């Protein structure tokens, strides 16, 4: 993650979510407004939503989504979720498990034979739970190469290293590599690319109309909020890095209202289980 990017904050209530109400204007809150003061005004901004019993009790944008033209952040602004994206990758895998197309204890190499022999014992469950022992693909990238890598490039990088950080299942270590591989597994098991699968099975059914696993040249991000860094006394756009095009670990864009729909769906699922 690059520093000083535009902030996206979602604070969810602790009680069960019953549904997703239409957008409402909420009065100022001195406590929240005070916390968000650094993101208010003519600076890269943030969006905050607080839900209580599934209903929005606070929804507000602060600052700017696009510094160059002064576009303000609103509840509809779409931010890059970065690692918050991983929950959608995990959900896609579990949908395919329900479909009978994947098994949590299947070897990852069953779907990704390009992985080296050292990865033979890694299961899909271990990729999901950050216990695979995979190397971090960012450590394998050439620092002199400024081209963006994609999920398939992550597999290529890992295939060249016949070693792990530890034996699968013996330790926990947060793994971006694992979720990039899971996105590829979703594609191979479903017969559709990862972004299309998410649209068809998660985003569209839940009414998350503005959420997208973004691919330059393939789709666009509506009402997009960009990231910036303060360089030489001015805000300069630093929205994309060499790893921003990897979808499975961090490439999804979404808004407050769409994430409220996602939270409502998760809570309904939990309620149905009980």
Language-model features: locations:
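Short, surface-exposed loop or secondary-structure junction motifs
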Residues: 66, 119-272
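Bacterial N-terminal signal peptides
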Residues: 6-18
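Residue-level preference for non-acidic, small/hydrophobic
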Residues: 32, 36, 48, 54, ...
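Short active-site loop at a secondary-structure junction
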Residues: 39-47, 68-126, 164-177, 247-250
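Positively charged n-region of N-terminal signal peptides that target proteins for export
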Residues: 1-4
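Short, conserved catalytic-motif segment at the N-terminal edge
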Residues: 26-81, 101-106, 156, 161, ...
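Bacterial signal peptide processing site
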Residues: 21-22
């Amino acid at each position: 993650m690059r520093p000083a990017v535009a902030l996206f904050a979602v604070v969810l209530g602790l009680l069960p979510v019953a549904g997703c109400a239409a957008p409402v204007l909420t009065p100022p809150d001195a406590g929240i407004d005070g916390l968000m003061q650094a993101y208010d005004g003519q600076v890269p901004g943030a969006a905050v939503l607080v839900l209580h019993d599934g209903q929005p009790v606070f929804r507000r944008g602060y600052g700017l989504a696009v510094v160059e033209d002064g576009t303000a952040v609103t509840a509809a602004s779409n931010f890059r979720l970065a690692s918050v994206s991983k929950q959608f990758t995990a959900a896609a895998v579990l949908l395919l498990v329900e479909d009978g197309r994947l098994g949590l204890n299947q070897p990852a190499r069953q779907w990704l034979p390009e992985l080296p022999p050292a990865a033979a014992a890694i299961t899909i469950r271990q990729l999901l739970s950050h216990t695979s022992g995979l190397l971090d693909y960012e450590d394998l990238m050439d620092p002199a190469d400024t081209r963006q890598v994609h999920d398939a490039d992550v597999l290529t990088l890992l295939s060249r290293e016949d070693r792990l950080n530890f034996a699968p299942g013996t330790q926990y270590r947060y793994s971006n590599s694992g979720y990039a591989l899971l996105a590829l597994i979703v594609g191979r098991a479903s017969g559709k690319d990862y972004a299309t699968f998410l649209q068809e099975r998660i985003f569209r059914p839940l009414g998350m109309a503005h959420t997208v696993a973004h691919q330059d040249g393939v789709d666009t991000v509506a009402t997009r909020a960009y990231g910036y860094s303060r360089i030489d006394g001015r805000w300069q756009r630093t929205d994309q890095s060499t790893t921003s095009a990897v979808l499975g670990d961090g490439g999804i864009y979404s808004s407050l209202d769409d994430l409220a729909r996602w939270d409502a769906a998760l809570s309904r699922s939990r309620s149905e289980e009980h």
